[in-house]
Amino acid sequence: MGIVFDDRTPAIDQYSFPLCSELSGRELILVAPKKKYTLKFEDDTLLTFSESGTAGCRCLKLADQLYFVTIGQNSTVAVIDLKERLATLVMPDMGYAFCAIEQDWKALPETRHCETDELVGTGLRWNFGSEFYSKQVYFSVDRCRMTWSPENYRFDNFPARYTRIREKVYLVDINARVPAGSYVPRGYDRFFMLQDYDKLLFVGAAFSIDDAAPLMLSGFGETDDLDPTLFGDD
């Protein structure tokens, strides 16, 4: 197991989900409270974003009509829910935008994705491969404890943010250092994971401070016998 490049897309190869092309050719208008954004998917690997122009993109599908999209290489991502006509944009200079998706002749949905504390007090082991996993403890609304195999005895405390996407589906955003010896190359320091707690599956990406291509992530979760002291807010 290691890093594989498929059409110049780095990913952890063992449990890597295939890239999704279902958004190719579509143009989406995302409506935030004070602004509109446009995402035009030129093809499977290229889109035009109204905020930054044309950029490379990669798309992973987590569930029916639910997609995780990377935009360029600077920690810009979108979670697109076509079923509920909702979207979340994360942009390094502008933060989060919780949006509705325009559709001709239809009113905008009243609900939006939102920040949540529903994960607080929970923890799981997320498996990227048979020998590579991350244990994560969501002990407060803005912090998590994380460890990587093989050094799973050492938990570090990192800034985190949790967004509710659907019932039991969340976007987890962690600013984390990768320890030496991990399968993730050094330099990747921001991790997005779109997590389904019913199916215990996830998709996402890691972004690098060195402006390298996003590292696509996917796999499955499982419960783990975590030390109760890890859940304390100290």
Q: What does each model-identified segment do?
A:
Residues 1-13, 96-97:
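Large eukaryotic, non-enzymatic subunits of multiprotein complexes that serve as scaffolds/tethers
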Residues 85-105, 199-200, 204-216, 220:
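Helix-rich interaction surfaces within compact, conserved domain-sized segments
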Residues 29-60, 130-163:
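N-terminal glycine/threonine-rich, aromatic-flanked beta-hairpin/loop signature
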Residues 88-130:
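Surface-exposed beta-loop interaction hotspot
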Residues 22-29, 44-48, 62-69, 119-125, ...:
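Short, hydrophobic/aromatic-rich segments at coil-to-beta transitions
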Residues 12-27, 109-123:
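N-terminal helix-cap/turn-to-beta initiation motif at the start of protein domains
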Residues 44, 55, 72-84, 92-95, ...:
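Extracellular beta-propeller repeat domains
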Residues 51-80, 151-199:
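Contiguous, well-ordered beta-strand patches that form the walls/edges
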